[in-house]
Amino acid sequence: MKQIVYAMQFKGKAAPGASPNVMKAATSAASNTLTTVVGADGIYGKFEPAPGGKAQFESEVTLTGATSFLEKGTIRFGDGNHRLHFSTVEHGYLGDSADPKLKSGAVMWRVDGGEGQFAGASGYITSNFTLSDAGEVTDNHFGVIFVR
């Protein structure tokens, strides 16, 4: 088995779904590099553009409580048929943040398989995200994926 490790920042929208407790998320991320520097002033990090294609993310979020949710979806990497399918491990969390216009949350997803490069894939992806009052999503992923 081979490991693929990635970090990407997805941006897009969340909108109401088919029922009152369901949302649909659609985001995308360009190829990037993540720089993290630790120094005398503390820590600094940023995503910077890199040559390459985009990843497309689509999911369905089901709210299960005041701050909890379940999620399942797909991430397509590039223009080919390289897709990951994922679902929530236990529950995700979405709550208030220090910015009154933003909700903030985190979730861990299990890779349930995939297609193309990800056929038979397994692993986990963590997501730390914000959701604005207008439905704008910024979603930071860190994934460790096992492929054949």
Residue map of PLM features:
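Beta-strand-enriched cores of mature, soluble protein domains
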Residues: 1-148
